């Protein structure tokens, strides 16, 4: 089963973020349209829904491509992805005016203020979550489609 190796890697990679973003979209739609919660998240949800699954798929293709030469665990490979996505996402959000840096913290959507002391934990939590998703979900899907 060595045919279409990279296509199988791409498809195994897009499953986790696609399912997660579908749940996020469903919760948002229920809150926004059913409960009439004023949440302006529709301005920013389209971009991640288009980009994130593709990034995960391409990152998994890179993992499969590098595996014969660079033997890293898939969890570690996935934990490296936030180091690329976080600066890109922060730059995009701040250039669109969705995130503002203040003297004492960061202001999201002109509604949610997070002090710098709490922001220390965000990268650690993000890296840990990516590690677990890649180790247990993407790794299992890679094994399921015969990639390892």
Give the ranges of each region predicted by the language model.
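Perimembrane helix-loop junctions in membrane proteins
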Residues: 32, 36, 64-68, 142-147
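Juxtamembrane/transmembrane-helix boundary motifs in multi-pass membrane proteins
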Residues: 4, 8, 39, 43, ...
């Amino acid at each position: 089963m060595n045919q279409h190796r990279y296509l199988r890697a791409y498809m195994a990679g897009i499953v986790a973020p696609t399912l997660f973003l579908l749940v996020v979209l469903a919760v948002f739609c229920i809150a926004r349209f059913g409960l009439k919660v004023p949440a302006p998240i529709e301005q920013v949800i389209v971009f991640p829904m288009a980009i994130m699954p593709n990034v995960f798929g391409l990152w998994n293709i890179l993992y499969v491509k590098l595996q014969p030469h660079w033997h890293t665990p898939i969890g570690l490979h996935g934990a490296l992805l936030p180091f690329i996505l976080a600066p890109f996402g922060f730059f995009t959000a701040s250039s669109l005016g969705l995130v503002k840096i203040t003297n004492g913290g960061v202001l999201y959507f002109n509604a949610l203020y997070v002090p710098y002391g709490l922001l220390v934990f965000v990268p650690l939590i993000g890296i840990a979550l990516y590690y677990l998703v890649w180790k247990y979900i993407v790794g299992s899907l890679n094994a399921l489609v015969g990639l390892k």
